[in-house]
Amino acid sequence: MCFNYNALQEHIEKIKESFDFVSITSIGKGWCKRSIYSLSIGEGETSVLFLADFSDTAGITSEILLTFFERLCVAYKNDLKISAVKIRSILREQKIVIVPITNPDGLEISCSDGENALCYKGLVQRAADNNFSEWISNARGVEIGKNFPYRFSDTKSIMKNSSAFGYKGPFEASELETQAIISFCKAINPKYTITLSCSGEYISCQCSKCASDCAMMTQVFKSVSGLPIKRIKPCEAYGSFGGWFSKSFSAPSFCFSVSKRSVADLKSLYDKYEELLLLSSIM
């Protein structure tokens, strides 16, 4: 069973009731009017932004981020440590912000075999050809991870029209989800970003004018996690969030990729990545 939009809302409501110091905001909506939420904790002026995978329609990266955020909240509230780090001290200096679902409509479409696509149901069924096992697009059949305004014209689009995957969209930032993430980044100006992915275990970094910082941080993350470093080919960055962010903000955009498992494996996955997530939030 996948982690769906209702489960996200229930989790957010639980956090809201338990931790009154958390800031929860809807930063935008998908085409089916499902909100894209951000959750923030901390008192500092600077922030680190974590995002769930744009193509994770099983909710694995969403669950990992929410578990991490809730652990931070408990430690902050009770003045506890995580991996020998005193969380309250860290969060007096900066904010940690998460966007636990970046493609809420895609998540629902995948989980419901297209039934929850609302007015886009017909489009979605045609685009998927009734096979939703590979669905990672939004309600208009656009793959969000290819829709960002970074060398968009050079971005390869496997599909020419709405599809379960591979269609970059009619023009750059054409999608509501893309626009919401862009506007949010401009509003909070994070010092760097970390996207969780579900495409095998590795660490990668995109940067345009901060190569030395990027290389140093990536090596530290590798030494802590034991994960290999993946070199991103220039063509792989076209249309991507990481390519857009690093170019627009002259700051690193990291990707921590996990193996694609079921949500039932959450604990073992989370335990493996907690120290890496914590370190990446305080550097």
Task: Label the predicted regions.
Residues 1-36:
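Short glycine- and acidic-rich boundary segments immediately preceding or forming the N-terminal edge
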Residues 24, 38, 98, 141-143, ...:
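Conserved beta-strand scaffold positions in the cores of enzyme catalytic domains, especially
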Residues 24-27, 79-87, 231-233:
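Surface-exposed patches in mature extracellular/periplasmic domains of secreted proteins
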Residues 26-29, 51-54, 99-104, 146-149, ...:
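Active-site-proximal beta-strand/loop segments in catalytic clefts of secreted hydrolases
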Residues 37-46:
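Short beta-strand-to-loop junctions in surface cap/lid or active-site-entrance loops
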Residues 45, 58-60, 65-207, 211-214:
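Active-site/substrate-binding loop(s) of hydrolase catalytic cores
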Residues 46-50, 96, 254:
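Generic beta-sheet signal
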Residues 154-283:
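Metallocarboxypeptidase
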